C-alpha cells in the first residue's frame, strides 16, 4: 500500500512468475542483430523525434542514460545511433535512477556549448533483469520501459509542445544503501559469483530517511538560484519509486498540502522504472501547463544521486 504500485510492465512475464526460475527469459541475440536494449531505445527515440518534428538527420548527439547496460561495449548509444542513421557522437551514461536528469544536463550543456545542436537522451530500462524476484523487499517494485527526450537549440525548435530548460542541478553523495555489485571482476573470485549482492539490493528505510531530505533541499535551492520561489512551481515530476516518499518530498517542497496534480503519480501503473519514471510522469502530465508555467523534473537514487531540471512551457 505504501509503495503505491498496482501493476507494471516487464519484457517477459513467464520467466518471472515461474517459481523454478523467477527471472525473465530474454534470449541472447547474435552480433548481427540489434540488441534488445537498443531496440526499445530506438522505438522511444523515433516517437520522441516525431513529436519534436525532427528526423534522425537532425540529431548530432545521443546519450543513453539508464541504470544498467546489457554489455560493456560497444556502447548501446552507438548501436542506436547506427540504427537511427544519426550523425555526430553517442555514449552511454549510468547514474542509476538519476541517469535521465544527468543526461538532460549533459545534453543541455552540449547544446549550449556548441558541441551539438540536437541531442537525444534515451533511457531504456530493463530493470526486471537485475532484480532478485525472490526477495520480498524488492520483487514487486520494478518495471521495464524506455523513454526518450529531444534537447535542441531554441532557434531550431518548431514543436508547439516544447519546454525551455531554465536551470539544472546535480548532486552525488556516496552510499551503499542501494547497491548492485555485478560486474566484470566477479569471475575473478568464484566464491562470489551469483551471490545475492550481484543484483539490486537496498536498505529501504535508510534510503527513505536520507534521500527525502536531500531531494527537497535540492529542489528548493535550484529554484532559488534561478530566481524562483517554490510557489512558482506548477508541477513536480518526481522519480517514481515510492508513493510515500513522493508525498513527503512534495509536502516539504511546496510547504502545504497538495494533490496529485501538483506531483503526478505513474508508478501505480508502471511501478519503479528507474531513471525513466520522472520522464514518464512529465510525458503524461504536462499538457495542461500554460505558456510560461514552470515545473521541475527530479530523479534520485543509488549513489546517492539527485538530478533536478527546471523547465518552462514555451
Features from the language model and the residues they span:
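Condensing-enzyme catalytic core mediating Claisen C-C bond formation in acyl metabolism
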Residues: 1-35, 135-209, 213, 217, ...
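Conserved beta-ketoacyl condensing-enzyme motif
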Residues: 9, 14-95, 225-246
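Claisen-condensing/thiolase-fold acyl-transfer catalytic domains that form or cleave C-C bonds
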Residues: 32, 38, 42, 68-69, ...
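Buried hydrophobic positions in well-ordered alpha/beta secondary-structure cores of metabolic enzymes
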Residues: 48, 59-62, 103, 150, ...
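Short beta-strand segments
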Residues: 65, 94, 119-125, 151, ...
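Short acidic, glycine/serine/threonine-rich loops at helix termini
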Residues: 73-76, 104-105, 130-136, 177-178, ...
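Flexible, glycine-rich active-site loops centered on histidine and acidic residues
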Residues: 114-145
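Glycine-rich beta-alpha junction loops
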Residues: 126, 154-155, 169-175, 239-242, ...
Amino acid at each position: 500500500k505504501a509503495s503505491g504500485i498496482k501493476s507494471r510492465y516487464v519484457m517477459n512475464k513467464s520467466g518471472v512468475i515461474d517459481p523454478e526460475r523467477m527471472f525473465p527469459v530474454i534470449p541472447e541475440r547474435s552480433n548481427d542483430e540489434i540488441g534488445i536494449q537498443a531496440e526499445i531505445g530506438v522505438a522511444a527515440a523515433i516517437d520522441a523525434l516525431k513529436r519534436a518534428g525532427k528526423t534522425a538527420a537532425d540529431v548530432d548527439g545521443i546519450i543513453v542514460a539508464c541504470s544498467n547496460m546489457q554489455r560493456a561495449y560497444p556502447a548501446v548509444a552507438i548501436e542506436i545511433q547506427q540504427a537511427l542513421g544519426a550523425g555526430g557522437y553517442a555514449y552511454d551514461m549510468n547514474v542509476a535512477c538519476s541517469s535521465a536528469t544527468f543526461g538532460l544536463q549533459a545534453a543541455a550543456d552540449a547544446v549550449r556549448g556548441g558541441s551539438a545542436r540536437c541531442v537525444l537522451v534515451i533511457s531504456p530500462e530493463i530493470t526486471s533483469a537485475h532484480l532478485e524476484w525472490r526477495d520480498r523487499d524488492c520483487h514487486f517494485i520494478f518495471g521495464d520501459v524506455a523513454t526518450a527526450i529531444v534537447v535542441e537549440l531554441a532557434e531550431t525548435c518548431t514543436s508547439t509542445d516544447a519546454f525551455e530548460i531554465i536551470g539544472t542541478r546535480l548532486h552525488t553523495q556516496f552510499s551503499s544503501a542501494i547497491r548492485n555489485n555485478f560486474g566484470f571482476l566477479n569471475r575473478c573470485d568464484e566464491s562470489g559469483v551469483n551471490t545475492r549482492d550481484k543484483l539490486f539490493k537496498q536498505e529501504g528505510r535508510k534510503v527513505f530517511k536520507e534521500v527525502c531530505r536531500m531531494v527537497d533541499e535540492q529542489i528548493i535551492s535550484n529554484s532559488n538560484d534561478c530566481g524562483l520561489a517554490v510557489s512558482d512551481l506548477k508541477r513536480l515530476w518526481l522519480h517514481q519509486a515510492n508513493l510515500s516518499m513522493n508525498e513527503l518530498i512534495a509536502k516539504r517542497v511546496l510547504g502545504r498540502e497538495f494533490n496529485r496534480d501538483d506531483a503526478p503519480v505513474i508508478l501505480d501503473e508502471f511501478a519503479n522504472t528507474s531513471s525513466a519514471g520522472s520522464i514518464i510522469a512529465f510525458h503524461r502530465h504536462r499538457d495542461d501547463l500554460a505558456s510560461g508555467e514552470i515545473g521541475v523534473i527530479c530523479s534520485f537514487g543509488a549513489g546517492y544521486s539527485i538530478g533536478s531540471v527546471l523547465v518552462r512551457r514555451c
